């Protein structure tokens, strides 16, 4: 076979094996050096792919797809800075244990570090943020195709093994890059006959169950049985089953459950929004848990960590399914590397339900105060009322993606827990960046196969503006709600706001760009409701149309700060005197 035929077969084998390993969705950015890979994907009828003019957007789209499916999307790009544009998404995927596969085309050996065009050091470009990084040889009959297949299988396994994360395969190609049908009778291809006929992967792998050890469960059951004021914290979870199991355990034992938005259970009607209570210092001093079991990873708000720093529990236990360190305050006394669902199941019946610690009247009163101060239909729609209305209307068959900074905090704090079934919610909280949010939400929606609402701030929106090109299609529509306070409002809540006269200039970065013009540029419908009543009606209708829509909610940073402070001032007395026995 000539070089064209060898390269064509080489890439066809890679793509086919990825599909057989259930990594059959490809995010491709056009380029010359990646021609063999791109055409191998396009030529395989089982491959699903989407083209992306921007590699950075493609990387975040793949991240969102992984969040929805638990499987890696495959990124394909040409050589040079193309692969470097994946870096932010790779970092987020690594930090939050999301699978991802990067296939970067590269120049051959003789074109590296000699001044040749579009050639950089691509091998191991992502450093410590990959689970595995490997450079394949240039296509050639000296390399057995069996070794190519087993390498692809190992890449998928490393991406999915705990902790899941990105894997990078760098693939050098020599010109000519155009395809040519290979000779199936060539001796080099002969060992593939059985594999081709089977339709099965070259090799399989079994994922570990990550059951807790009997000894650790005995210890944990004893701690809970002896605890006087236990507390469960549900942080970010890798799947819905974990969150539901933890919620069921908390209910059966009567243990208060601080459920973060990333846990997947915060919006459930069975969930108590302890975030509101933990804002109040008097409540925190009175509550003082002695045993805390933290299921999963990060939480959005600072309230629980600050409370536990002031009143350290006797035992702080972390339950996670992978060995990554999670001890940001260096106060963890026991770590269980196991599935949260498995641990929750093993703890059932370890004690009688905890008496008291309910505060039902307080939470009912707090809910009424929030609705009265922020959500009356005639009032202007705000950064507090918008997430509360969204959480109350988005139901089964719909999903929610929330951007970082204030949208995440306000949804976590003020969302209405009314969903009859846990609403699928996702955030990029691995490193909590504001970049690539629209792209991630679009990938999340595509992976779920569900229409999705994105709640996002104006700076995050502008940061990923070109991703709006992903929305003008009829499938998996995205409702984008832009909370436009003309800058970074979160800085108004930070100590720096009172310590400098350069808040706007150096931190808030005021902007006056037109959200409406951006929507028009990308052919997306646009609306700008003024009141809560208008927004409620508009959003309820949007949920039924199955069409992408950008809703701009205009806000003033000073008024937003005042509303947050006024609301907290009204809520504080409720929890200062809360009767936790009811």
From Swiss-Prot:
InterPro entries: DHS-like_NAD/FAD-binding_dom (IPR029035), MenaQ_synth_MenD (IPR004433), MenD_middle (IPR032264), THDP-binding (IPR029061), Thiamin_PyroP_enz_TPP-bd_dom (IPR012001), TPP_enzyme_TPP-bd (IPR011766). Gene3D superfamilies: 3.40.50.970, TPP-binding domain. Its EC number is 2.2.1.9. Pathway: Quinol/quinone metabolism; 1,4-dihydroxy-2-naphthoate biosynthesis; 1,4-dihydroxy-2-naphthoate from chorismate: step 2/7; Quinol/quinone metabolism; menaquinone biosynthesis. The keyword Repressor does not apply. The keyword Zinc does not apply. Keywords: Magnesium, Manganese, Menaquinone biosynthesis, Metal-binding, Thiamine pyrophosphate, Transferase. One of its GO terms (biological process) is menaquinone biosynthetic process. Belongs to the TPP enzyme family. MenD subfamily. Catalyzes the thiamine diphosphate-dependent decarboxylation of 2-oxoglutarate and the subsequent addition of the resulting succinic semialdehyde-thiamine pyrophosphate anion to isochorismate to yield 2-succinyl-5-enolpyruvyl-6-hydroxy-3-cyclohexene-1-carboxylate (SEPHCHC). This is 2-succinyl-5-enolpyruvyl-6-hydroxy-3-cyclohexene-1-carboxylate synthase.
